[in-house]
């Protein structure tokens, strides 16, 4: 079977699933390249290349995994985030474009502050998962030192490997902690606290795409009946841990604008930023 034939067959298999139809061609091509260890250019250059039996078997196995709604990122073990390649496993939430907007918002706030200050920025990433936020901020803010916390030891292992991959281990420290609970009081003076916490109401579980509902870590998604269990703990902790005028940056869910604004009443400069679908997605506020 040639590359072209294998790709056509896999695309048809994936397209037969209503949950996978929209991205069937893209996913088939990604899986083919991953199975063969070839680039996109190599795939296009020789579509009539014949697959060996071992290559065909490897490709078929990946397609079968995808047909169970296993996310493409878990199959390939990779996801790009803010221009950086990250390792991902089922232990971590797959980084999403909405969280790139959170990073962009923090960078916009901090770059001027960094220029105006001779001191390094101290940043805390709460619920770091793959390390995406911590790594992107450290990469783009060369004078920043980041503490990244997570309750999951498996997630922290993934995050640490990603920091090493991007040569950032000297400026990112990973700590096992339930929110800020494990951080000593003398460390609680951050310039920025950023977080993409769990915020999906448990009642919304059935409405999630099967690949999210069935494969991504529930602890990184769900936050009680209304989705605010983590926010209610995190926001007071963040206020105590920020320096005066320090920045809190949170990703929020659809329909959570008013409740988040209420939880952040008493903070300064509250702003809610919309995503590309005009849904409020990022909350920014300054400690009084």
Question: How would you describe each model-predicted region?
Answer:
Residues 225-285:
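Conserved Class I SAM-dependent methyltransferase catalytic core
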Residues 14, 110, 163, 238, ...:
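Conserved hydrophobic residues forming the short capping helix/wall of the S-adenosyl-L-methionine
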Residues 1-43, 51:
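Non-catalytic accessory regions of SAM-dependent methyltransferases
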Residues 98-207:
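Conserved SAM/SAH cofactor-binding pocket of Class I
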Residues 31, 69, 99, 133, ...:
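Residue-level signal for inorganic ion chemistry
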Residues 76, 176-177, 252, 274:
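Short loop/edge segments at beta-strand edges and connector loops
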Residues 30-109:
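Conserved AdoMet
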Residues 199-229:
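Mobile active-site "lid"/loop adjacent to the S-adenosyl-L-methionine
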